[in-house]
C-alpha cells in the first residue's frame, strides 16, 4: 500500500489501535510507524578524516587503463620542463661512416636488396680435408665469416619479403646452403680434434708415453 494512502487512512481513523488496523501484509508501513522507536539515521563522527568530505585519500581513484581515464587531480610529470622537439631542418647533416661494421650486413654496393647475379656468384663449400689442414685461428675466422654472410642473406630475404620482389629466393637459398655445408664441415673437424684430444688424455693417464717406444727402437 502506498505511503500516502496509509497516512490518509490513519488521519481518517483518528489513531485507531492496532486491532482495528488493516493486516500487516496489506499496510506494513502503518504498523511499523506505530511501533518503531526513533533512532538516529544520520552518521556522526568527530574525527577529521570523516569530516573532510572534499578530500580523497585514494590517489589512484578514477584511473582506468580500460576506459583510458586519468587521475582526478593534476599530476606533475617532472620538476623540469619537457624538451621541445627540434626541426629536422635545423639539425646538422651527419655523414655516414664509410667503414661502419653494420655495412657487413649488406652487399658490397651497400644496397638494401642483393641481386640474383650477386647471390649466384659464389664458389663451392670447403671440404673436410681442406678444413683439417687449417689452424684453430683459421677455423675461428672462417666460421664467423660464414655467420656474417648468412646474416647478410637473411637481411636481404627480409627486405625481399617486405618489398614482395618475387625474385632472388632460389639464388639466396643456394648460397645459404653452400655456407651451411662449410659450417657443418668446421664442426666435424672440431669434433674430430676433440675426440683425438680425449683419446690422448686417456692414454696419458694409463701410462702411455711415446718417447718410451722411441727408446726401445
From Swiss-Prot:
InterPro entries: MRP-L47_sf, Ribosomal_uL29_mit. GO terms for molecular function: structural constituent of ribosome. GO terms for cellular component: mitochondrial large ribosomal subunit. GO terms for biological process: mitochondrial translation. Its main location: mitochondrion. Component of the mitochondrial large ribosomal subunit. Mature mitochondrial ribosomes consist of a small (37S) and a large (54S) subunit. The 37S subunit contains at least 33 different proteins and 1 molecule of RNA (15S). The 54S subunit contains at least 45 different proteins and 1 molecule of RNA (21S). This is Large ribosomal subunit protein uL29m. It comes from Neosartorya fischeri (strain ATCC 1020 / DSM 3700 / CBS 544.65 / FGSC A1164 / JCM 1740 / NRRL 181 / WB 181) (Aspergillus fischerianus). The gene is mrpl4.
